[in-house]
Amino acid sequence: MGVTKKPDLNDPVLRAKLAKGMGHNYYGEPAWPNDLLYIFPVVILGTIACNVGLAVLEPSMIGEPADPFATPLEILPEWYFFPVFQILRTVPNKLLGVLLMVSVPAGLLTVPFLENVNKFQNPFRRPVATTVFLIGTVVALWLGIGATLPIDKSLTLGLFQIDSI
């Protein structure tokens, strides 16, 4: 490969550049030509070879074969629409369901304005954005899992029983 040059940390010029956050060109292995000419093509060709090999050796069907005379018992949307489907399925009023779906992007648009005071990038130092993300993720997973269950078990995920009056 290439020649790796060890840095001389006693060099005052290098120490001054390292103190300013510079000086990375003085040591290490160069990206050109080692990475760009030798490593990247091997990785790219290896990835292509693995994909072609898997496609040839184990071809998979795209979905089930179509049968126009057999309707499935329950028609479900694609997996990324499960939370929205669950909202529409459980909310009795359709207008309220549409308003709930519109409130999700509207709420996400307000988060930068709530967090505008905080300039940190670390999520542990941005509590509002982190809390909104965690609560949104839990609710989306809860609704997504509930959409795959029958309607009577969808809100509780079958974990506990709610007695209706």
Swiss-Prot record:
It is a multi-pass membrane protein. The keyword Transcription does not apply. GO terms for molecular function: electron transporter, transferring electrons within cytochrome b6/f complex of photosystem II activity; electron transporter, transferring electrons within the cyclic electron transport pathway of photosynthesis activity; oxidoreductase activity. It is found in: Plastid, Chloroplast thylakoid membrane. GO terms for biological process: photosynthetic electron transport chain. Its main location: plastid. The keyword Membrane applies. It holds the Pfam family Cytochrom_B_C. Gene3D superfamilies: plastocyanin oxidoreductase, Single helix bin. SUPFAM superfamilies: a domain/subunit of cytochrome bc1 complex (Ubiquinol-cytochrome c reductase) (SSF81648). GO terms for cellular component: chloroplast thylakoid membrane. Belongs to the cytochrome b family. PetD subfamily. Component of the cytochrome b6-f complex, which mediates electron transfer between photosystem II (PSII) and photosystem I (PSI), cyclic electron flow around PSI, and state transitions. This is Cytochrome b6-f complex subunit 4. The lineage of its organism: Eukaryota, Viridiplantae, Streptophyta, Embryophyta, Tracheophyta. The gene is petD.
